[in-house]
Structure formats: C-alpha cells, structure tokens
Amino acid sequence: MSAPTILIMAGGTGGHIMPGLAVAEVLRERGWRVLWLGNPDKMEGRLVPPRGIELVPLRFQGVRGRGAAALLKLPFLLARACAQAWRRLADIRPDVVLGMGGYVAFPGGVMAALRRTPLVVHEQNAVAGTANRWLARLARRVLSGFPGVLPRGEALGNPVRADLCALPEPAERYAGRSGALRVLVVGGSLGAHALNTTVPQALALLPEQARPQVVHQAGEQHLPALQQAYAQAGVQADCRAFIDDMAGAMAQADLLICRAGAMTVSEVAAAGVAALFVPFPHAIDDHQTANARFLSDAQAAWLQPQASLTPQWLAQWLGQRTRQELQAVAGRARTHALPRAAAHIADVCEQAARRAS
C-alpha cells in the first residue's frame, strides 16, 4: 500500500513557509509523502528542498501594490497558473491539499477544489491574507493561528519550535534574578531600523545605574550601524547579526522588544516572555497590529505603534518596568500558548483525507 500524499502550498515569506515545514515534518514522521507547491524563484525555493521535500514548481506572485500595469496582467497570469496547478494536481493526485498562505496557494487551492481534492486552509495572521480569504470559501476545513479570523475557522494556533515550548515556566525562570533588567531586542533576520535607532537613544536617556542589560539582534547588514549607534549613545550592548539559539535568548530575557509577525507573537506565548510589540506599520492590512492585540488585549504583552515610539517615550516606559511585573505578564502570555499546533493541523489533514476516501 502506497503512502498517503499531501501537497502543501505556501510561499513568499517565512511566516507562511516555516509553519508549513513544521506540519510537513509531523506528517513525514507519520509515514506521509510530502510535496510542496511553490515558486522556485522565491523564498520557498531556498528553504524547502534542503529539508528533503520535493518542490513542485508554480510560478505565480501577487500584484497587490505593483501598479495598474501589473493589475492588467493578472487575469492572464492567474489563468496560466491555474492551468499549471491543474496539471500538477493531476500528476500528483494528492490525498489532501494544505494551503498555508501566500499568492502561490490561490491557484493551487482553487484547482484542488475543482478536482474535489480535500482542501485545508491555515491562516497564520489575525487578519486573513487575500489568498486565504478566497480559499476559505472552498475549503473542507478552515484553521487559524488566532481566534475569529475566518468564518468556520478553528483556532488551532501556529506551529512553533519545540525548544520554545519546552522552556521552564516564567515563574521558575524569573525566580532568583536580581540586578539590571535583561532586555532582548529582535528586529528579525533583516533587522528593524526603527528599533535599531530608537532603543540606543532611549537607553542613553536613562541614568547609567537604571539601564537594562541589552542583547540586540540587528540583521547582518545593519550590525555596523547598530554598533555605532550604541557607541555614539555611550551605551553598552551585546549587538549581534543573528541569534542562533533564540529559545535560550528568550529564556534569559526579562523583556523582549520586537515586531509582531504571526510567528513572533506565537513564539512569545510559547516561550512565556514579556514583550513590547512594535508592529511593522506597512504590513498589508496592518495585520501585525491585529496579531499583537491577541496578547496585549489580554494584558499579556504591550503594544506601541511605531509612529509614537520615541526615545523619550521608551526611556520613560522602561524606567517604570519591574521584574515582578514582567514575570506576571510573561505568565499570562504562556497561558495563551498552543504548543501542539503542528500536530493538530496534521490531524485535521489526516481526517480530511480519510473522509474523502
């Protein structure tokens, strides 16, 4: 008897791809054959094949924000992508198709529905993307990382790394700490210019004895400028291009200052760490603000728009924080974690395949 087959569709950004890879790993451990529909010229082309997963090529990308000329080409590009997707599905004949977001998922999902192949959709963000908003109408099951995102949606959470979920409870980690607060600043792999400029200036406004210990991840191309910014501010900080052991860094931190991508918010909850979210202001549909509110509305994190993140505000805000308060916020964040999201999404895919057989 041949192994059951799933076709995962996700592309464009790590926020779509990494959760899909987590589900893929669970299903492979259960004996499934996993293939991936994606654009080989985009990020999935770099991330998926090294994991031993075959990338089934489909070259399609969105036109939102690309101008009128690109919009005029959309019907032709979409028709071509749908024809390609139909052929790929006919060749593969998957038992179930999982759409994790990104424009490449749209033609594949539509063609899967037309072929009556079970379609499962998972939306990571608190505001659904364009592709998933449409595909949710065609899907057998609709899943999400946060509650209330899509009609018929089941909030199963976002898959996060096991090492974050395995961290001790915040009360255990924070116990016995003394001295300066430990602050971890993370701008993502490419860094975040607003954090790289504002945090050093804010710390310079604090009395030296009141300054926290800072580990600041900036992205490789921004590291020299960040080091210069701290030097000019007269502030000591551990500046890094990347942090290989993010779980360890979060475990040591009293406070995390970061963006609010879906995976970041889910990782904050999984780790149980106090966080100040500064959403990227140009995210489509301002979805990072909605992501951050999942925790901030529950007093399990703080949310500060970038437009009002001034050095003066941040210095005053940091000066008011205590380790006891941060521990309480971290504990509330941990209560919102859904550590078995990848396994639960895999369960749904298996159920959809069985019901169709």
UniProtKB/Swiss-Prot annotation:
- In terms of superkingdom, the source organism counts as Bacteria
InterPro entries linked to this entry: GlcNAc_MurG, Glyco_trans_28_C, GlycoTrans_28_N
The biological process GO terms on file are: carbohydrate metabolic process; cell division; cell wall organization; lipid glycosylation; peptidoglycan biosynthetic process; regulation of cell shape
The metabolic or biological pathway listed in the UniProt record of this protein is:
Cell wall biogenesis; peptidoglycan biosynthesis
Q: Which UniProt keywords apply?
A: Cell cycle, Cell division, Cell inner membrane, Cell membrane, Cell shape, Cell wall biogenesis/degradation, Glycosyltransferase, Membrane, Peptidoglycan synthesis, Transferase
Molecular-function GO term, any one: UDP-N-acetyl-D-glucosamine:N-acetylmuramoyl-L-alanyl-D-glutamyl-meso-2,6-diaminopimelyl-D-alanyl-D-alanine-diphosphoundecaprenol 4-beta-N-acetylglucosaminlytransferase activity
Q: Name one Pfam family in it.
A: Glyco_tran_28_C
List of residues binding UDP-N-acetyl-alpha-D-glucosamine: 13-15, 125, 161, 189, 243, 288
Q: What family classification does the UniProt entry report for this protein?
A: Belongs to the glycosyltransferase 28 family. MurG subfamily.
Q: What does this protein's UniProt record list under function? A: Cell wall formation. Catalyzes the transfer of a GlcNAc subunit on undecaprenyl-pyrophosphoryl-MurNAc-pentapeptide (lipid intermediate I) to form undecaprenyl-pyrophosphoryl-MurNAc-(pentapeptide)GlcNAc (lipid intermediate II).
- This one is known as UDP-N-acetylglucosamine--N-acetylmuramyl-(pentapeptide) pyrophosphoryl-undecaprenol N-acetylglucosamine transferase
What is the native source organism of this protein?
Bordetella bronchiseptica (strain ATCC BAA-588 / NCTC 13252 / RB50) (Alcaligenes bronchisepticus)
